[in-house]
Curated annotation (Swiss-Prot):
Belongs to the bacterial ribosomal protein bL36 family. PROSITE patterns: RIBOSOMAL_L36. It comes from Carboxydothermus hydrogenoformans (strain ATCC BAA-161 / DSM 6008 / Z-2901). One of its GO terms (cellular component) is ribosome. GO terms for biological process: translation. GO terms for molecular function: structural constituent of ribosome. This is Large ribosomal subunit protein bL36. Keywords: Ribonucleoprotein, Ribosomal protein. It holds the Pfam family Ribosomal_L36. PANTHER family: 50S RIBOSOMAL PROTEIN L36, CHLOROPLASTIC (PTHR42888), LARGE RIBOSOMAL SUBUNIT PROTEIN BL36C (PTHR42888:SF1). InterPro entries: Ribosomal_bL36, Ribosomal_bL36_sp. The gene is rpmJ.
Amino acid sequence: MKVRPSVKPICEKCKIIRRKGRVRVICENPKHKQKQG
């Protein structure tokens, strides 16, 4: 899980979702998981 000021999709399978007011990226590739913080 990467914590970044700006989250961007890295590949085509990355999805941007909002959970509890936080922006997250979920993906098949665990290295692509990100959250904004």
